[in-house]
């Protein structure tokens, strides 16, 4: 797919990997809808990127909020060609620590945002992309998910985070096989350690 002239929804686009991806897409001639919970940072990033970027305050794990983001992308730029799933959180906590067992609420929150939120965006963006006319190569869209090396080599205190990223890895192939019939490519990257606000906040 040609980036130039295409529209991408980037979750977590206000900072870190999401912001870097959005900047790269705009520099390559694409248009981006930044979907992030951090409204001040998201609006500032959209302002930095100029007229080919817009922002929508988004909770990716909430159906109504996610639908609003997809609609905002289509309203702003006329169509949606790609999803770059970068939004996520991390919680460093031992299964049994000095203060007792791992918080079940924390575990559920990490899974809800990282895994359920990613799937929520995939299904809604795929629906929108499915309405596109295919390009010369038969493509209607592309989806890039962000897992982590932790999905394969999780470290001490990463049970929740590794489980959430492992889930992203596991669902990629069945989703890719299903959406291939609609001309939508699906892939997942698994980065190592990067200096992002999420990591520095641990």
Task: Report each predicted region and the residues it spans.
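Canonical Rossmann dinucleotide-binding motif of NAD(H)/NADP(H)-dependent dehydrogenases/reductases
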Residues: 2-33, 175
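The beta1-alpha1 cofactor-binding region of Rossmann-like NAD(H)/NADP(H)-dependent oxidoreductases
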Residues: 39-40, 57-69, 104
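Substrate-binding pocket helix/loop in short-chain dehydrogenase/reductase
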Residues: 94-111
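Active-site loop immediately N-terminal to the catalytic Tyr-X3-Lys motif
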Residues: 96, 153-159, 181-182
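Active-site helix of classical SDR
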Residues: 122, 164
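Alpha-helical segment proximal to the catalytic Tyr-Lys
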Residues: 127, 177-178
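Residue(s) in the substrate-gating loop at a strand-loop-helix junction
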Residues: 148
């Amino acid at each position: 797919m040609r980036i130039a002239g295409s529209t991408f929804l980037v979750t977590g686009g206000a900072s870190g990997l999401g912001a870097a991806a959005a900047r790269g897409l705009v520099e390559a001639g694409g248009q981006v809808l930044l979907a992030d919970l951090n409204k001040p940072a998201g609006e500032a990033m959209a302002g930095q990127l100029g007229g080919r970027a817009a922002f929508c305050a988004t909770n990716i794990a909430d159906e109504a909020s996610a639908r609003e983001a997809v609609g905002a992308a289509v309203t702003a730029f006329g169509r949606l060609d790609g999803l770059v799933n970068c939004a996520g959180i991390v919680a460093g906590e031992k299964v049994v620590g000095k203060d007792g067992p791992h918080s079940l609420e924390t575990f559920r929150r990490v899974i809800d945002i990282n895994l359920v939120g990613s799937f929520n965006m995939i299904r809604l963006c795929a629906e929108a992309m499915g309405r596109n006319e295919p390009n010369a190569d038969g493509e209607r869209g592309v989806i890039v998910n962000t897992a982590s090396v932790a999905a394969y080599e999780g470290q001490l205190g990463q049970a929740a985070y590794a489980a959430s990223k492992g889930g992203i890895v596991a669902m990629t192939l069945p989703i890719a096989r299903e959406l291939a019939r609609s001309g939508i490519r699906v892939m997942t990257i698994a980065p190592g350690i990067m200096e992002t606000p999420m990591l520095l906040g641990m």
